[in-house]
Amino acid sequence: MREYQRLKGFTDNLELRRRNRATVEHYMRMKGAERLQRHSLFVEDGCAGNWTTESGEPLVFRGHESLRRLAEWLERCFPDWEWHNVRIFETEDPNHFWVECDGRGKALVPGYPQGYCENHYIHSFELENGRIKRNREFMNPMQKLRALGIAVPQIKRDGIPT
């Protein structure tokens, strides 16, 4: 059994924490065409993706080229997207941050009627020396369905106390 290593809390690695937090803040502030450069915030083989998909498997984009193509698609399909009500949480690990926020913007996804998406998000950022290694995005998939004009199934909750 591994011995538990006690961390120093949030007072260790202050310069690394500052650098990593600045990257997370920059990522969350990016809007419009600026998002086309978001891949530059990642390590070369870094990845980002949505962990709440209809398949139950994450949709992951790995490497600068894949992340760049994703940004182009996002710019076309969600042109005015913005994060707001952003709250950034540090952890005991100076290389791991969590973000809770809301997102909103037009949804112009091919094959679906034009819509508007508003959702609540949780992001996990794993970083290395100020660059993102992995960004995982979690949100309510029912809100995504509504934004795309897809009927949302009704879940029966008979017997659940209210």
Swiss-Prot record:
It comes from the Bacteria. Keywords: Antibiotic biosynthesis, Virulence. Pathway: Antibiotic biosynthesis; phenazine biosynthesis. GO terms for biological process: phenazine biosynthetic process. Induction: In liquid cultures (aerobic), phz2 operon is induced by quinolone signal via 2-heptyl-3-hydroxy-4-quinolone (PQS). In biofilm (microaerobic), phz2 operon is induced by quinolone signal via 4-hydroxy-2-heptylquinoline (HHQ), a precursor of PQS. Pfam families: PHZA_PHZB. Belongs to the PhzA/PhzB family. Involved in the biosynthesis of the antibiotic phenazine, a nitrogen-containing heterocyclic molecule having important roles in virulence, competition and biological control. PhzA2 (operon phzA2B2C2E2F2G2) has a role in the biosynthesis of the phenazine during both planktonic growth and biofilm development, and in host infection during biofilm development. This is Phenazine biosynthesis protein PhzA2. It comes from Pseudomonas aeruginosa (strain ATCC 15692 / DSM 22644 / CIP 104116 / JCM 14847 / LMG 12228 / 1C / PRS 101 / PAO1). The gene is phzA2.
